[in-house]
Amino acid sequence: MPRLFLHTLFPVAALGLLLTACTAQPPRPAAAAGSPEAAAAPASAVGRYPVANAGQLVVVTASGWDATEGELQRFERDGMSWHRIGVPEAVSLGRSGLAWGQGRHAMPQGDGPIKREGDGRSPAGVFDLPGAFGYGPTGHSLMPYEAMDASDWCIDVDTSPFYNRIIDARQEGEAAVAGSSEPMRLDLHNAGDDRYALGLKVAHNPANVPGLGSCIFMHLWRRPGETTAGCTAMSDSTMLTLLSWLDPQRHPVLVLLPEAEYARLRSAWNLPAVQVSR
């Protein structure tokens, strides 16, 4: 049976890795705001108040739509107020910047491209963080965790019935993973590559709509500033701090936005004030 990408519980394990590939197919033209692609997320996945039930926020802001670096900040809710936890931490983003993704938010009208498969952009918006994953048998978090095996793949082929899902080739057959560029054990498929040793799943494109982007993660980086294919990458220490803090009982969500969009939406979405250290 395939494991739904948005609800699979992933393993958080070994240190020192970074997830980089979130989509790796050739880029396609960006969809315009208001297009059918922009409206593809189901009603249950969007809303005017996308952080209403969240008790923890992982906020990533970037200088603009084409920025490839950003800052990660953590917040906890106390009643109607948000309180910052810790200090801002550097992260790397998609090689082409950001684009509106499909998540908990209603698709805003205004500037910004729409996320497409292979565009090299990290999805912007508000997204659930369903769980963690990694190479080791145990995690470093209260978050649901699943250890990945050599036969586990995230399918980024948008013509596949398993698009945007984690599947086990031993169960679904080798043909089911043909053409995918996302083995979840990169170390076993790419000469010891440890980038996926520790990470978090980002619930982007919950309806698994073909072409709107797949296999989005938060993960470790190999070196500061190294861009991704659409994920958010960070240092080992930042990931471990994040994982040790996250609590599934508090409904953690990721908010990823350019600074101007964050400022525009802050009041309407009840977002906390962020610190800009640049």
Model segments located where?
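C-terminal motif of bacterial Sec signal peptides marking the signal peptidase cleavage site
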Residues: 19-21
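A conserved hydrophobic position in a structured secondary element of the catalytic/binding core
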Residues: 234
